[in-house]
Amino acid sequence: MLAKRIIPCLDVRDGQVVKGVQFRNHEIIGDIVPLAKRYAEEGADELVFYDITASSDGRVVDKSWVSRVAEVIDIPFCVAGGIKSLEDAAKILSFGADKISINSPALADPTLITRLADRFGVQCIVVGIDTWYDAETGKYHVNQYTGDESRTRVTQWETLDWVEEVQKRGAGEIVLNMMNQDGVRNGYDLEQLKKVREVCHVPLIASGGAGTMEHFLEAFRDADVDGALAASVFHKQIINIGELKAYLATQGVEIRIC
């Protein structure tokens, strides 16, 4: 059995790490490189960086900080933000990123997933999915351009259908960003994760809702996700990564202990 992964998420805007609630009202957390170094030292298995306004601004992720991060950490990291071409991806990988993640650009041009996978290998192609639960219809819908409130829109894709589609096109991993739960720290959407797990045959990463160590345990134990991504509980030092891993190990979760 592969070890489960603990993944701090760093949302980046204007060269700073920020954090919002349900993708809104972002506050500045701090500088990118020191935070990345801290999480690596605490025992994170990998890091994910989202340049949250790159796609909505029509630009690619700011590459200036990518190489600086690569210089100070020795764990894998993934970068996302406005990657719309093979050239964009090649540059980011050349600066030291281990994976690239696409979200809104994949919705705009699903063939991008296949082209990236063919060029760089499925192992480094992650598809992020921003999913919103509509209580009126009881359905999960994929959203696009979520980094800019004025441009955010609901797509025609239902989440489960899009999960299946991106796998067919070559996604090597899926990060499910559950927007309803984002930043509120009341637990991952286990019901949605279980439904996605049934149709997801590549590594699945849960994102949105972690508030306690038990929430991580539930995601691993009840929804069988491969990794759990979180931001605010780590940024605000509510949960220490080393202590979280020790707790999960006592609960029988296969986890890498530093």
Curated annotation (Swiss-Prot):
Annotated keywords: Amino-acid biosynthesis, Cytoplasm, Histidine biosynthesis, Lyase
Record's subcellular location: Cytoplasm
Pathway the protein acts in: Amino-acid biosynthesis; L-histidine biosynthesis; L-histidine from 5-phospho-alpha-D-ribose 1-diphosphate: step 5/9
Record's catalysed reaction(s): 5-[(5-phospho-1-deoxy-D-ribulos-1-ylimino)methylamino]-1-(5-phospho-beta-D-ribosyl)imidazole-4-carboxamide + L-glutamine = D-erythro-1-(imidazol-4-yl)glycerol 3-phosphate + 5-amino-1-(5-phospho-beta-D-ribosyl)imidazole-4-carboxamide + L-glutamate + H(+)
One Gene Ontology molecular-function label: lyase activity
Enzyme Commission designation: 4.3.2.10
GO cellular component, one term: cytoplasm
Entry's family note: Belongs to the HisA/HisF family.
Function: IGPS catalyzes the conversion of PRFAR and glutamine to IGP, AICAR and glutamate. The HisF subunit catalyzes the cyclization activity that produces IGP and AICAR from PRFAR using the ammonia provided by the HisH subunit.
Name recorded for this polypeptide: Imidazole glycerol phosphate synthase subunit HisF
